[in-house]
Amino acid sequence: MSKLDEYVNLPYTLIVIPDLEEGGFTAYFPELQGCITCGESYAEAVNNAIEAKEEWLTACIEDGINIPKPNQQVVSWL
């Protein structure tokens, strides 16, 4: 398993919120500073976030930047 695969499979928190001003959804990983994307639908935002996470992690590995560990807290809203 590659170093990238190890990081991609870690349980990073994904937050997806509706964009009330522009429409669509914004998705981001709070542990991965600057790893943010959007999509016209919830599913598109999630898929874009998965791709963005892999690109973000790849850039960090290539540049020798320290990658934070996932937050172990459970996040939920009612």
Report the location of each language-model feature:
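A short, exposed loop/beta-hairpin motif centered on an aromatic-Gly-Thr core
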Residues: 33-44
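Short, charged, surface-exposed hinge/linker loops at domain edges
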Residues: 1-13, 47-78
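Short aromatic-glycine-(Arg/Gly/Cys) micro-motifs in beta-strand/loop hairpins
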Residues: 16-32
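Short, positively charged
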Residues: 9, 15, 19-21, 39
